[in-house]
Amino acid sequence: MKKVLLTFIVALISLSASAQRKGDFAVGLRGGPTMTKIEFLGIKENYTRWGAGAFVQYNLTDHFRFDLDGIYHFKKDHLSDVTVGLDLQYLFDLGEDVKFFPLVGYALAFTHQDAYEVNNISSDSENSTDGGIQLGAGIQFNLGDNCFVSAEYKFQPGILGDGHVVMASVGYRF
């Protein structure tokens, strides 16, 4: 866990050091629900969790950018997690202030389950890591030269089950 956090911090620092031109670098806040379909030992369950976090974007060209985010999913049923994802997005201009982007990336989820007891059966505290690809799309609306809002959908097959992530974001470009 410490190595992953250190890698995340180094990535943030290196992105900020290389962002020299206006519009190349953005930061912001992101939040929304994650709907997960969990199948285990013949049991199927749909599970919705809410998450919030931050993101950093770096434009490689006028159309390609990296999006690095960290999302904390609030505790539900003794389970919480932090998901760190890195996406490559391709931007299509739909108008002067509107962009559409498909995305492909990879995410790691670091989960923590608290110890609990149900019907005299106890569970130990447990930490685990899961990872996999994520595919999706989003739309961005520019609010002037530096501010923007966006919405995106990501499908995460195999990350803590099959996850469907819907996020709204607000950001600021440097």
What is the predicted function of each stretch?
Residues 33-40, 71-78, 108-114, 144, ...:
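Sequence/structural signature of outer-membrane beta-barrel proteins
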Residues 40-47, 74-81, 96, 130, ...:
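Solvent-exposed loop/turn segments connecting transmembrane beta-strands
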Residues 78-104:
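Helix-adjacent hinge/juxtasegments
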